């Protein structure tokens, strides 16, 4: 879903597991759908962790724990590894997450998140661990993600870190533009350049 991104302040969902791959994010059996049906993919985010094989709810999994919720997923190192399926980003966005925080993302998945209006924020290992500690100490603790300033702040500790983002992707997120929207927005500039170049 296209949404302009500025500053998000939210509680967080902690997932302190390393190397969460795209098959765990959205299992392969749900890839038959080739259009972005947000509710379908969101409902099946982390499907094999959220439910037991018999279809009953796994109450031990964090998404089923009423203590935790919000628009920010805080995940362990190497998030989104494995296959390049864009469906994984569709599932994350479809569930309602607008930010994923980790100390490292698989490159293709990171780009897929950006293309689907989810902001991947890379932080240091130390900052990530402090986030987990703060969330577990107080599930209502909030984190502020400021895209214009490119900062993330743990409001429990007051500590902030700067994060990097490609300037083009930042522009698109802040203005709610996908790649096609950007080309349309830039039409006059492109035509002017073509006229000068002839």
Stretches found by the model and what they are:
Residues 1-76, 80-198:
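Cytosolic catalytic domains that perform sulfur/thiol-centered chemistry
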């Amino acid at each position: 879903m296209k949404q302009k991104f500025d500053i998000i302040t939210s509680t967080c969902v902690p997932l302190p597991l390393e190397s969460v791959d795209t098959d765990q994010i959205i299992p392969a059996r749900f890839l038959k759908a080739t259009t972005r049906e947000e509710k379908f993919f969101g409902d099946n985010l982390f499907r094999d962790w959220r439910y037991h094989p018999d279809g009953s709810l796994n109450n031990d999994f964090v998404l089923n724990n009423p203590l935790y919720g919000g628009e920010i997923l805080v995940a362990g190192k190497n998030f989104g590894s494995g296959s390049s399926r864009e469906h994984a980003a569709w599932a994350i966005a479809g569930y309602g997450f607008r930010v994923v925080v980790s100390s490292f993302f698989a490159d293709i998945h990171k780009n897929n998140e950006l293309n689907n209006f989810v902001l991947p924020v890379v932080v240091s290992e130390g900052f990530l661990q402090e986030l987990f500690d703060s969330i577990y100490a107080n599930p209502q603790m909030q984190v502020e993600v400021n895209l214009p300033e490119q900062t993330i702040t743990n409001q429990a500790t007051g500590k902030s870190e700067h994060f990097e983002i490609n300037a083009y992707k930042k522009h698109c997120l802040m203005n709610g533009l996908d790649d096609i929207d950007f080309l349309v927005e830039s039409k006059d500039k492109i035509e002017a350049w073509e006229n000068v170049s002839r």
